[in-house]
């Protein structure tokens, strides 16, 4: 019997890097909502009293970027007397956006391998490799460690916003360690929560008393509600529970650490449980395959698992800049597939159109901001891009496609042919 512990982390929306991801995606939403053909590569930097957006944008949209940035920061919770050194109302906002390089634009606008099909005309915005993953550990077909870490982070933000724990401040991180036996989760080994807070908590100022009060409150108002519907639940008797291990966490957010777009790519995906191609998502329009192809790879992997063709599936895609069709497609089922990896790969090649133009069209990636009232990508920028029961994400809707795959495999077996 194999036994091991696997750990994943999440961060709250007030973490400096996540502020940047949300600002970058808010810029993307605003541009696409007005002009669905916008080309966007927006990077954000935050530090004490400063937020700067930079990158490349080609768009007909007219956006008040400074007002937009302040609104995002304010909604996260950095405003007023408790904002510290990063206040939405007074921080400097710098805008340094250029146009997209014409050398890149020509490859995206007119793919090298098009032969009359309009979808062949949309080439990949860059070369790269992308991975998608799914497994049957949770209802949303995500690994349990990252799923639980996100639950804790979302709940941590919720009790701050609704005033349940009014001493909490926006910055925070969670980490969950899960015990596996024979690749199945069997227990929650450790829960770690680091959360920013006011210097005084419920009339207490002694550091030890403050820490104990926060620990008790988080167990009652965060840990227990976040895990209430899980078959595996943490226990004070058997689960190691750590809160603010350094003792206190008063100085946080951009005042404590600078932030940058794209520095939480493992938090954004599978918590390290699956491989990652290295490309970030936030601030990038759908022609960037770092984003759109990673969404498609997740969709494919989730379809395979939802169809019962594998208990675990990892899908790798690769692209060349300016070329529409993927350079390669590979499925790995880690020995859990009902058929071989080669057969699963061929099934994917037959039933999924993974050209960037087709991905964009299927998931309406250019139209989603306008269809969602001007806010779509921004909501993916905190608490993960996959396995989000709180959001209606088109790449997570696999029921119909999974049924098609199951029927195709059943038909193949009936005919006695290989794929």
From Swiss-Prot:
Protein name: S-adenosylmethionine synthase
Origin species: Synechococcus sp. (strain WH7803)
Binding site for K(+): 43
Binding, L-methionine: 56, 100, 257, 288
Organismal lineage: Bacteria, Bacillati, Cyanobacteriota, Cyanophyceae, Synechococcales
UniProt region (Flexible loop), positions on chain: 100-110
GO CC annotation, single: cytoplasm
GO BP annotations, alphabetical order: one-carbon metabolic process; S-adenosylmethionine biosynthetic process
Family the UniProt entry places it in: Belongs to the AdoMet synthase family.
Assembly and interaction partners: Homotetramer; dimer of dimers.
Function: Catalyzes the formation of S-adenosylmethionine (AdoMet) from methionine and ATP. The overall synthetic reaction is composed of two sequential steps, AdoMet formation and the subsequent tripolyphosphate hydrolysis which occurs prior to release of AdoMet from the enzyme.
Gene that encodes it: metK
Signal peptide per UniProt: none
Binding site for ATP: 15, 171-173, 248-249, 257, 263-264, 280, 284
SUPFAM superfamilies in UniProt: S-adenosylmethionine synthetase (SSF55973)
GO molecular function terms noted in the UniProt entry: ATP binding; magnesium ion binding; methionine adenosyltransferase activity
Residues annotated to bind Mg(2+): 17
Chief location: cytoplasm
Localisation per UniProt entry: Cytoplasm
Broad class of enzyme this protein falls into: transferase
Cofactor note: Binds 2 divalent ions per subunit.
